[in-house]
Amino acid sequence: VTNPPIDPFREKVVMSLQCPIGPEANILQPSALQVHRLWLKQPVISIADIEVFKHLSHRGWSSHVIDITFPVAEGAAGYLKKLQDICEEADNASKKHQIIILSDRKAGPERLPISSLVSLGAIHHHLIETRSRMKVALVVESGEAREVHHICVLLGYGADAICPYLALELASSLRDQGILDTSLTDETIYQNYAQAMQTGINK
């Protein structure tokens, strides 16, 4: 909180949502590794972007997808076990990959997703404890995130980037049904959504 409050409109020239993601080198030892990172213009990424991240192989970078769903039949015991498992999986992935993607895409009638906040927070703090957090970027692919508040909380819990795929797919579905302007492309839908999120985050 600032006093007077920051004005995102009048002070737009000095505000930025750019997100450098990936391994961070030691700032006390100048080297090319300090700039060997990905720079995003803002933290909300498209479905196409997340697919690029999943298949990344440029300049020695790679990614690892962690499924944050578990079988419904396993109940509470399965929930707790899965939470521990994803923390260990993230720790192992941090040794070989630069981007870790937390995804609930496999959620369905037989598989429940662990809350993206719970899984993200658990992994973020586990990697801090194992001194691995600065080695990787944490990207969240979640159907939960829809509103500005959801995005802000995920960022606060340690996310470097977020793909709110369900919100984007819903908008595309409404367009296909003729409820939204049928001339809108997937890219236009994403740009409009991302701009709305940016305005909300700045506020």
Q: Which residues does each predicted region cover?
A:
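Conserved structural-core and active-site-/substrate-pathway-adjacent residues in large, well-folded domains
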Residues: 66, 102-104, 123, 154
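Extended, highly charged accessory segments
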Residues: 1-91, 101
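Short, well-ordered coil/turn segments that N-cap beta-strands
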Residues: 62-64, 96-99, 132-136, 160
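Phosphate/diphosphate-binding loops
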Residues: 122-203
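Flexible loop/turn segments at secondary-structure boundaries
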Residues: 24-25, 35, 72-75, 107-111, ...
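Glycine-rich, proline-tolerant flexible connector loops at the mouths of alpha/beta enzymes
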Residues: 102-118
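Conserved helix-loop functional segments at active or binding sites
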Residues: 72-75, 88-99, 105-108, 125-132
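A cross-family glycoside hydrolase active-site/sugar-binding cleft signature
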Residues: 67-69, 102-103, 139-141, 165
